[in-house]
Amino acid sequence: MTLTSPPRTRADSRYSWVPAAAGWTVGVIATLSLIASVSPLVRWIIRVPREFVDDYIFNFPDTSFAWAFVLALLAGALAARKRIAWWILLLYMVAAAGWNVADLLTGDESVVDEMGEVIGLAFHLAAVAFLLLARPLFWARVRRGALFKAAGVLAAGMAVGVLVGWGLLELFPGDLERDYRLAYAANRVFAFAGVDPDAFDGQHPHVVVNALLGLFGALALMAAAIVLFQSQRSENALTGEDESAIRGLLELYGKNDSLGYFATRRDKSVVFAPNGRAAITYRVEVGVCLASGDPVGDPKAWPQAIDAWLALCGTYGWAPGVMGASVGGAEAFRAAGLSAIQLGDEAILLPDSFRLSGPDMRAVRQAVTRARRAGVTVRIRRHRELSPEQMAEVIAHADAWRDTETERGFSMALGRLGDPADSDCLLVEAVQGGNGGQERSDPGDGTVVAMLSLVPWGSNGASLDVMRRSPQSPNGTIELMVSELCMQAEDIGVTRISLNFAMFRSAFEQGAQLGAGPVARLWRWLLVFFSRWWQLETLYRSNMKYQPQWVPRYACYEDARLIPRVGVASVIAEGFLVLPFSRRNKQHTGHHTSAPQDLVASGVLHHDGTAPDMSGLRTDTADDEPPRLPEQVRVRMAKLKALQADGVDAYPVGRPPSHTAAAAVDSPDDVELDVAGRVLRIRDYGGVLFAQLRDWSGEVQLLLDNSTLEQGSTADFTAAIDLGDLIAATGTMGYSKNGTRSLLVRHWRLTGKCLRPLPDKWKGLTDQEARVRARYVDLAVNTEARDLIRARSGVLHAIRDTLYHKGFLEVETPILQQIHGGANARPFLTHINAYDLDLYLRIAPELYLKRLCVGGVERVFELGRAFRNEGVDFSHNPEFTLLEAYQAHADYHVWIDGCRELIQNAAMAANGEHVFLRPRDDGVLEPVDISGPWTVKTVHEAVSEALGEHIDAATELPTLRKLADAAGIPYLTHWDEGAVVLEMYEHLVEDRTQKPTFYKDFPTSVSPLTRPHRSIAGVAERWDLVAWGVELGTAYSELTDPVEQRRRLQAQSLLAAGGDPEAMELDEDFLQAMEYAMPPTGGLGMGVDRVVMLITGRSIRETLPFPLARPR
């Protein structure tokens, strides 16, 4: 049978309701006939309408199981749009109409009978008309020769029934005479007792024999109906070319589905998308076309493949069904009109994160230990590494250890071992009594006691196909093989492993939870009960112990009433019910290639089913639709192709220019020079062309004149060059006619083709979000963005130079840290697979720098990145540049002048003078002088000024709370005096500060790493530098007392354990280092991004080259 699909009739045809209506009408009669056959009450209730329908419209006997069965088959066939059912119903309606017409013409009927016959005739004519109009909608075929086969079955059944009935009448004649017995049997079996009983002189046999005679006829009729309406079987499976095409699609897109390789199972049929870029494999069982897993191939072509598959189902009257679809596949099938229900979950192991340690893996760990103690080792090989003799032994083991007579599986099993086309499959063997081989592929000299075979999942995955173990294998053998496979995954190039499928996993899990409802518990109980035969719970638990990632799998169906039928088809397909003449596990059984003829004719496919020539397949399955690109991009791409066709290298190797643009403008006229940069403007005046060229130093005008160009013309320049292109030009400096200094170009070359247009040449990028996301474009067209990059670089250079001149050493300390400390902030968490260890991105380098101080590094600093998982606004970025510096034998007073000098030198480097740039109300930036000393205040003094009430370190907590309430400052009830003062400081002082000011002597309780004040109790030697509401830096007289340091960090660790995400953890290594004694030290921490922000007058996002942006 050729599986090419004719186009389906449009579903929105105005007569699309006819098949369903015909099926429902006949189905209602069949149902009522069946119920009336067993219920006298129903038979009495429907007697009047039944007799009317039976007399004038449709044969509707009061009791007939056979007729009800036949009508039910006819109704199903009509609903399935089978053409033979259409013919039967049409001919019946024509015959019934003719019968009514004949009765009307006789004129012997009563008025009531004539009215009934007129109504019946009208119904028949209407039915005939609608059936004729809807004829194209009945496209489904039945099996070839079904009509003749049904007639033969009916004739044979009737003949056997008559002969057997004749024999019964001879044995049990009753009062029936011998001469009547054969005729009586024929009347009861063949004519359904249509002959008047008076013809037999009132004689009749025993009632049981009489019933059996009628049953024989009914059985013959039912058998004929079954044969007549039976759906077409799929007699075509994979050919070599089909399998080769599928393997090619798996090479290109196999990473998407762990079950994709099972599409090469050879007892499946296949239907391809018209362009060959996707395919669906399936089997037909009990009239269900059962697809396995997701479509194979390009997800963009899945809809076309699904349409072709549904068209095929419609052509032959198959009910569509899908087993084992992923989320993406189920969505695609649902978009095509099917419904989806979750079957269960697939267990996925990620070797990078697989560990035997931890309480959750205790059962696996113990099982592995038992197996190893029993002398079991594991070896892993690709199938191609096995000799034919070794593979024969593997197949023998698989057959011997199988616990069923036949191989099971359909959607999640390959059904073969040892095929040369499957050379990339993995074989994992458990070997007992030997060394298991010194190398991974060494067979060793032991006895194989278990095996796993896994098929490829893309280029870096493996999906379990076969799992076998000897009855004599030690406990834990399977666990050992799975664990070793994960441990050696990197060596064999595997990053993901698909294990068994756990059906109804969520039901087992939810039904066992505390507080599960009665329905969930009952459903779980039923599954556990049936697991005695089907191992549902065993599969779930065998997978669950590995702590896998559960990936849902779905079954899809067209209509809810078809779920049982799809389920039966699945049971048959999976091998739980084996039918005669099954083609399971055979070699290529296909008679007709289903792959698109263009693909077959290309010659890239292989007749033996091996993978095709991939370069040819990529060409033959290329997307016919070009990518959707803006018009200007398409124009530039066309120019690029034209240049490449002419032999022009649009992206050549670099060659340094002799001058920058700025240097070229200042060069003498008679010096030949080279410049390179980006073209920003082009003005073409025919034979003369002007182009504005920009590099990092500035801009220079290019003048191209046809009379001076040594090669090409200005027309060649405009044909090849677009705004934004990178070019190099050679010539001498001169002047244009209007006196503009220009480079008189003699020849030029393209150094980089820009494929996307630049923004407006006058406005540039005006949207701030666009400037952040496309900083490279902003830098290319916006001189202000370049100035900010220069300013930032100048600030960093000035800070380093200032510290270098003071004798400081620059160091680098770890960014990945096991304990977050050095500041109170929420950290970012990451994980290192090599040590299976959670790590933090550092929030500050302080604790490591202090270790260096303990070691004798007296002046040290680090200028690097820190990370804090906090908010994002004009002054905060999760990733930022932080300066921390420590000077031995100094205190926090030393750093007041040191910090001011650093910032003033940075301002000089960026702005040329000691100024910050501040925006006015109209947005224009104006300089603000920051030279000279800066104001210094204590925290309590500043808060007192803001409150208008005096407070100090001795002010009690109730008084502070009362003042906070009066000022509208929120606080938490568990805060101490220091925390309340700090909250008032942040709201009343820090936010309102303008000129740079040092606020010193903070409460001790909010300064855990700072030494207590030398003369004032309750405060610590710490200052914060604030300017225009932004904290720029902080400095401490560092706490060097290791005992006090331990006490404070222990208090912080208690807060962290209590759920405070910003509290520091206890760093025992740091505390141990401090016990070796650190000299009296003054430490400085400064946010460089904020300093740049105030120096340039911009937000922090503008001053960072690439700030973190919210995903689109």
Swiss-Prot record:
Which PROSITE patterns does the entry mention? AA_TRNA_LIGASE_II (PS50862)
Q: What InterPro entries does the database record attribute to this sequence?
A: Aa-tRNA-synt_II (IPR004364), aa-tRNA-synth_II (IPR006195), aa-tRNA-synth_II/BPL/LPL (IPR045864), LPG_synthase_C (IPR024320), Lys-tRNA-ligase_II (IPR002313), Lys-tRNA-ligase_II_N (IPR044136), Lys-tRNA-synth_II_C (IPR018149), NA-bd_OB-fold (IPR012340)
Per its UniProt entry, which superkingdom is the organism in?
Bacteria
Where does this protein bind DNA?
675-748
- GO CC terms for this protein? cytosol; plasma membrane
Q: Is Transcription given among the entry's keywords?
A: no
Q: Where in the cell is it found?
A: Cell membrane
User: Membrane-spanning residues where?
Assistant: 18-38, 60-80, 84-104, 118-138, 152-172, 209-229, 308-328
Its chief place of residence is: membrane
Provide the residue span(s) of the region labelled Phosphatidylglycerol lysyltransferase.
1-613
- The entry marks the following residues as binding Mg(2+) 1, namely 1024, 1031
Q: Name one GO biological process term.
A: lipid metabolic process
Q: How cofactor binds (record note)?
A: Binds 3 Mg(2+) ions per subunit.
Q: Which Gene3D superfamilies match?
A: Bira Bifunctional Protein, Domain 2, Nucleic acid-binding proteins
Q: What cofactor(s) does the depicted protein rely on?
A: Mg(2+)
Sorted keywords for this record are:
Aminoacyl-tRNA synthetase, Antibiotic resistance, ATP-binding, Cell membrane, DNA-binding, Ligase, Lipid metabolism, Magnesium, Membrane, Metal-binding, Multifunctional enzyme, Nucleotide-binding, Transferase, Transmembrane, Transmembrane helix
**Keyword Zinc attached:** no
- Please give the residue ranges the record annotates as the region Lysine--tRNA ligase: 614-1112
- The catalytic activity of this protein is classed by the Enzyme Commission as 6.1.1.6, 2.3.2.3
Q: What does this protein do?
A: Catalyzes the production of L-lysyl-tRNA(Lys)transfer and the transfer of a lysyl group from L-lysyl-tRNA(Lys) to membrane-bound phosphatidylglycerol (PG), which produces lysylphosphatidylglycerol (LPG), one of the components of the bacterial membrane with a positive net charge. LPG synthesis contributes to the resistance to cationic antimicrobial peptides (CAMPs) and likely protects M.tuberculosis against the CAMPs produced by competiting microorganisms (bacteriocins).
What is the protein name given in its UniProt record?
Lysylphosphatidylglycerol biosynthesis bifunctional protein LysX
Source species of the chain: Mycobacterium sp. (strain KMS)
